[in-house]
Amino acid sequence: MRILFLTQWFEPEPAFKGAGFAAALRARGHDVEVATAFPNYPGGKLYPGYHIRPYRRETINGIAVHRLAIWPSHNASPIGRIANYLSFFFTALVFGLLRGRRYDLVYVYHPPITPAAAAAIFCAIHRMPFVVEIQDLWPDSVGASNMAGNRITRLLGKVCDFVYRRATLIIPQSSMMLERLHERGVPRVKMRRIYNWATYRPAGAGATVAYPKGFKGRFNVVYGGNLGQAQVLADAIDATACAALDRPAIHLHLFGDGIERQALEMHAAKVAPTHVTFHGPVGRDAMDRVFDEADLLLVQLKDDPLYTITVPSKVQHYLACGRPIVAGLAGEAAELLTESGAAIVCPPQDVPAMATAIGRIAAMSITERAAMGHLGQDYYNTHLGFDRAIEDTVAVIDEAAALWALRKRTSNEHHG
């Protein structure tokens, strides 16, 4: 069938569900096109070679990509963020109204909720099915980030309820998220939980080792991703400083960008000036090679009930890399990592516990750390792999199309 993949973020941005996802759907017999924004995430600035215009069509890996106008912004300003989300809502809505009839089904990636709201409207007008994949639970996450007041949060809640009612099927990324949605009135029969997979790609055979800057002679703790409020990386910096008191070789490397980067750099300069390095954002393949050379991978989320129901895609990625993990997480993500045997899990924002965990893994032999990493890879391949997730996703798409066809046939018979 002809599928429109609607997502605000897509290559060359660090999008989790990007060209690889679209190509996988196409490889399984579907004709896929993408509607997305001009790339500006995570820094809020347009990528080189792009200029804002109403519309631009390009091709990425053989997939037709429709670029729609957006207000570039991803800073701490609520006004800028709202303009960013609403501008893409309107351009996605116009695109869907004008061209939506060309497709048999729309697959929407959320967050943010605004593309899904646009799809809910134009799919209702065109009488076509749409599937919503939920990676981040709104409005909870917006409230937790302090980006919006109570009035806006309540409005977003109503928008989410509207989207969930209109969606043909919904894909939450964790079992606990599914339960939270059910508590809000979404029928279980309408939801299909599918875990994320890793975008990690192993180095090719015969690849030479190229140590990242500042890696040699150190015990390298690596974080790669968004430097935002939810990650509370100041705590990771504090834990590194504490662990390095006993083991001076411990060094934290932060790869990526985000609204907290400047504040984190200032904090690191005060508490751990010789034990933290900011490398900025790097490409996906380059980041995977950094992970390959890391001694330890780190992930943390804010101590908030919201984050107990999400499984950050970083969890799957780190497991696939085959490196030991220290995780400041709670809930389903913590359970997965504990079950894998590849991680030491500590409570979120518990600096002493994280420092102890980093020190414990630093004290292990290379063989012991390698064994932990292999456990993670085995767990990922068995329970969380790409092929399994894609097959499950294709099954949901086919089911949504079949449900819609049945409803349409039943409606026609009723009116006939």
Q: What is each of the regions a protein language model found here?
A:
Residues L97, T114-A117, I121-I125, R151-P172:
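Membrane-proximal helix-turn-helix segments that form the acceptor-binding/catalytic region
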Residues L296-V299, H317-G328:
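Short hydrophobic beta-strand element within catalytic cores of glycosyltransferases
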Residues M1-N61, T199, A243, R409, ...:
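N-terminal subdomain of nucleotide-sugar transferases
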Residues R360, T367-T382:
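A short, well-ordered alpha-helix in the C-terminal region of glycosyltransferases
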Residues A210-Q231, A236-A241, H253:
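Conserved donor-binding/catalytic core segment of Leloir-type glycosyltransferases
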Residues R247, Q262-R289:
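Nucleotide-activated donor-binding/catalytic signature segment of Leloir-type glycosyltransferases, i.e.
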Residues M176, I194-W197:
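Carbohydrate-associated surface elements
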